[in-house]
């Protein structure tokens, strides 16, 4: 069971809005933040919209690690995997 936190999701939004790719120097940290998006659908009313929003952000940032993570997250949401996630 994956736990996601609102603070991590907020961090992803701020990264997505940044035009400075050097802010993503720590890819493992970015990957962990994106993992929170995968279970964002289980937190509040995010659902599929949350996954699509994350996908758009990942494309804007343009890094393979983030795009790959978000695509995996959207796949989990479409298959109902997000139902196994919870919030802190």
UniProtKB/Swiss-Prot annotation:
Origin: domain of life: Eukaryota
Pfam family, one: Coiled
Entry's family note: Belongs to the hssA/B family.
Protein name: HssA/B-like protein 19
Organism expressing this protein natively: Dictyostelium discoideum
Lineage: Eukaryota, Amoebozoa, Evosea, Eumycetozoa, Dictyostelia
